[in-house]
Every structure is written in structure tokens, then in C-alpha cells.
Regions:
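N-terminal core-binding DNA-recognition domain of tyrosine recombinases/integrases
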Residues: 4-20, 26-94
Length: 94
């Protein structure tokens, strides 16, 4: 997805994130994008309820609370970036 690629580029070149951190963001965002893709939900349509359903999805994968919190943190950053770039009109985390 172009938005993910642009965001990762921003993290690499503007924020100077490490390769391992970028790989983590890539993995976590890919999981979320696949989740919304299966439900035919666009980034613009993501709201509080989609995030809640994604949280259920993560819990069903038996991930640790720390890992789930990291996924959510990555998504918060991603949506903050998307709002700042005016790619989406609202942030489901605010």
C-alpha cells in the first residue's frame, strides 16, 4: 500500500528510525492492512469500532499485552501521520 510505504519512508529519512524498528512497523501495519482488506474497509473508513475489532483479532492470536500495545502504538503513529498528510480526515485514536 502506498500510504504504508510513504509512512515507512518518512520514519526512515525524517525520523531516522533503525532498520529493526522499521521492520517492526512494516510487519504490524501489514497485519492491520490485511485485516481491514479482508473486511473491505478503506483507511478513510477506519473508526473506533474497526480498531476495537482489530484489538479482538490481536487477542485471538494470543499475543502478549506488550505486543498488542506495540501494534496499537504503531497504528496511532500511522494514523497521526495520515491525518497530518490529509490522507484521512479523522484519527480513530483521538
Amino acid at each position: 500500500m502506498d500510504e504504508k510505504k510513504t509512512f515507512l519512508h518518512y520514519l526512515k529519512y525524517q525520523k531516522n528510525y533503525s532498520v529493526l524498528t522499521l521492520e517492526s512497523y512494516d510487519r504490524e501495519l501489514t497485519d492491520f492492512l490485511l485485516f481491514i482488506g479482508k473486511e473491505s474497509i478503506s483507511l478513510q473508513e477506519v473508526d473506533y469500532y474497526v480498531i476495537q475489532n482489530y484489538l479482538i483479532h490481536l487477542n485471538e492470536k494470543h499475543l502478549s499485552h506488550t505486543t498488542i500495545n506495540h501494534y496499537l502504538s504503531s497504528l496511532r503513529s500511522f494514523f497521526k501521520y495520515l491525518c497530518k498528510q490529509e490522507i484521512v480526515s479523522s484519527n480513530p485514536f483521538t
